[in-house]
Amino acid sequence: MIKRLRFGLFVVAVLSLTLCLPSTGMSAAPSGEPIVIGYVGMVLSPGTRPCMAIQKVAVDEINAAGGVLGRPLKYVIADNKGATSLSVEGARRLLMEEKAKFIFVEGRTEICLAAQENAAAMFKDYPHIMIFNGPMGRELTDRVLDEYEKYKFCFRDWDPEPSHYAQQRYFWGETWKDRFPKGLTKMAILWEDLEWTKPWRDGMPDLNLPPWEEMVEKDYGVKVVYSKAVKPRGTMYLPILQQIAGTGAQQIFYVSSWFTDTESFAKQWADSAARDIPVDLYGGVSQTSDFWKLTGGKCLGMVGSFTECRIPLTEKTIPFVEMATKHQIPTQIHVHLAYADVYFIKKVIETAGGTDNVDKLIKAMETVETTYSLGKMAYETKKIKPYFHSKVRVDPADPQHTTYPGVFIQPIGQFHNGGKIQYLGGSCKENEPIFKGVGKPSDFVMPAELRKRDKK
């Protein structure tokens, strides 16, 4: 009983995510039975909450424009408080009590796996589509091919770990040459100590993919002089940075995510003996200008994806960023995806002719394509693990070297003085024409030089 009360039902008018949207010119008001979209995630997470907020905006926009096939969308949140058990319970309640047809699960592989298994057990009685919002764990889509009939309703709106080899080869083999014209021979790597980084730490022999450390040393001549797995939150970084400074590393690569306390890392880095060693952040809250404010400007010189970009990557990029900024929603990569997901679902329902036939919905999920703010939203249909039912990015036949052009356009930027972003290009050769005139790798400036400029 206590658990039921605590977990409640989170129609929370979607939880105070009603964002006080301004009234808009309405089309004919949608009517009939609502199509329920649910989200299972941690409401207080700085990574997950923006996804919920932006999806609520998308739902309100669609309803204001007449709904989907004349029916309204209803958005419901189940707060898992960061716990796996509450994630399973939340998804169950969304299915049984809210009759959800589409359920999103926050992007932690461990949580997604548990929710997926429970959803598979309930699928016969409660047919639905489950979408994993941002996790990389290959297991999630490996099993879709292994047991298609059991897991055919599961999709991942991000790409699995093997899809990121082409990106790293491009960075290490191409763009870093321009950033470090005098040469780079030593680097340090910090790994977020969670399951999703293990395939890169250990390699994936079944896919003939080496560990990243082996790859960068063997293929690009850069010796990894320091490597450590660290807790995603609460790590005392100063001793680690002191050790890195003593290794002679010329670069720090932090394989971080939206759960990593990169703001704490940035503050400690700026005051450490390693402050002159450039830092690349793999992911996290550094993807928007909020990071400059969160760190009090101590992220000066750091590099990473920057997706609060007013660059016309597609026709939807600038309108999306301006809309999200208006609602004070940070535009990290997974937030772009979360918004795009709702409009993708709209097209899926229209293509399937409604929500009554889940097999038609699954077929539409597999075949529909839409344009969104960072490229194309579509799912891989080649039956190769773990790409099948994951968002398209690389060619599964050549994941180390070939990226599909235009499907995921990833701006790379460096924080310069005053919080200005200097773009350094993209994350693959196939998309570099998009960044012509915007920025290039040689526009990189060493952190020590940027600090000198601050003093002038």
Predicted feature residues:
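Beta-alpha junction/loop-to-helix N-cap segments that form part of ligand/metal-binding clefts
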Residues: 29-34, 46-56, 65-147, 157, ...
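Segments of small-molecule ligand-sensing domains
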Residues: 326-335, 346-430, 453-456
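Immediate post-signal peptide segment of exported/extracytoplasmic ligand-binding proteins
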Residues: 25-39, 67-72, 176-186
